[in-house]
Amino acid sequence: EYAYSLGHFKSDNCEADDVVSIWAQEALDAKEHFVIAHIDKDIDMVEGWHYNFNKETVYYICEDQGYYKMCIQMLTGDSTDSIQGLVGIGPKKAEKLLSLCYGKDKMLAKVQEAWQKAHPEDWKERLETCWNLIYMRRDWDSFHRLTIEETLNDSV
């Protein structure tokens, strides 16, 4: 009852993570100050100031760091959210694969290369599915599923 009395926000067709990401993008665009308080590692893909209330830490994620974290998840998957990554690629191997990739286009190219190697017949469909499950929306209008071409265009 207490939380309800403070007001709430109902979102149809949008996960809470996406709402946070959209609001963060709106704040960035408006040059407003904000801090995202959370314990969800997925939110670390979102640019801006973060506060982890379990660890009591404040830190900043820049755009490239957020994209890097997303690419790590595109390789490893996310067992909590039942998102399948690439077999045999855990966090350490994913970090090693991306270690010499500077810039979004290079990171995404490395992710694409890994998916092509693991699934030569249907890598494109699998990668697009993974992208659409992991990518956090930046605006209210992006309801459609992305294709690999749109994914590549979004990365630059």
What is the meaning of each model-derived region?
Residues 1-155:
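Extended two-metal-dependent nuclease catalytic cores across DNA- and RNA-processing enzymes
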